[in-house]
Amino acid sequence: MNIKRAKEEIEHTVKAYLAKDALGEYAIPAIRQRPILLMGPPGIGKTQVMEQVARECGVALVAYTITHHTRQSAVGLPFIRQRHYGDKDVSVTEYTMSEIIASIYAKMEATGLSEGILFIDEINCVSETLAPTMLQFLQCKTFGNQAVPAGWVIVAAGNPPEYNKSVRDFDIVTLDRVRRMDIEPDLPVWKDYARAAHIHSALLSYLELHPQNFYQINADVDGTQFVTARGWEDLSNLLDTYEQLGLQADEDLIKEYIQHPKIAEDFSAYLDLYYKYRDDYGVEEILAGQAKPAVFARLLQAPFDERLSLVSLLLAGLNTRFAASRQADAVADACYAFLRETKKALATLPDDLPDGSAELFSQQVADYDAETQRQREAGLLSRDGLNTRLQVQAELRRWEGELRRANAAGTQEAFELLRGQFQTLAEDREKAQQTASAALEAAFDFMEQAFAESQEMVVFVTELTVNPVSHAFLTENGCERYFQYNKDLLLDHRKAALQQELAAEQRRHGGM
């Protein structure tokens, strides 16, 4: 299965394993809660999936790479204890708590979450001394004499033997106690994730043209050459930061992430062209509605991959604006909700209490900061979610400063001041939405003049539809031309499907 399907199955499993009956007991007894065993090539996204599932299910996550552990840290350290059995005093060996089990309790204490996921990576690559412990863990859900706490779902991951020489096969007794999922690389599924994760547009455009270069692991006389989904994502993060700093990514740098020389060389050459197209065509000028006439003449002679790269650049510029608009929306919505709670709280204060409004607001802001920190430590915030809360914190702190400087005479005056601050924020949100909408209209003007209803327009409209950032913006704010083109595309798809059905029916009748 692909990683998206595996994520859905793990999410459903967590919900099922943590479901309780009318008496408050787990509906599926712990002994029947089979651990999940994910088997797949390295760098496919197994660890990230666990982070997403934990965040979306609202549970804690404790993750370990078991190859970093010795038997002592996994099982615990031995010590001697005196026992009295029958009429004899004897010395027996006991063990301290496993470091892994202890980390679960530490996570519960730090986050306040009593339920979670224990994720053990590279479980089939352990040393010979630790192998029996891992078998016991999968079969009995214990490390040494310490059981995994109730309410914690066990997920383990490993690599097939063709990817790792250290792999140990599990026997049938162990496999009969786990739920095994075999995961394969899937570019279309990864692209869905990549759009939501804001993966660099150059990578997505390149992989659209060269899908065979998404994931490869090849062994030859020179060693192992490979490129993985993890490599592409990590490179994307670096490229984003390099662009912000005005730094140039060269071929040597790319080879540090894409450890397949031919693919690294190919992508490096494409990236240089990608940046060249951005500058030559003036993407920002196009989105400002100021496309140069020479651009249209050049496109008439341009090969398809160049035209497709330009479409990708336009989409990247739009998505930056859509994301800014969405972020402004999220911050404004959160501040509005906060302001409503402040209004309720202010109504409970005596109007003549000195500095009462400022003190109350400061306490509310401090509580918001503490909740952000709690969710951050618990791993319950996505990257976008964390950015939103941090921006809200900064905005609220600014309001707090304005409120203290104003020295409001009463609660009503304090609230009016805060409402004025929010109005400025609402105006900023409106500007961000207008900027994005204007750029979208300019992009459609350019696309219609340059490509009309060609394949490039199909790609443009399709990407606007499938990208969650653009889709959310269009759903909220609309765009008449987008909806018209999207409707025409759907009609064309239905017509093509009907023609295929008719052709198949004719072939069947012709064969009779």
Model-derived segments and their meaning:
Residues 1-212, 220:
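AAA+ P-loop NTPase catalytic core and its hallmark functional loops
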Residues 300-512:
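Terminal-proximal interaction/regulatory segments of ATP-powered molecular machines
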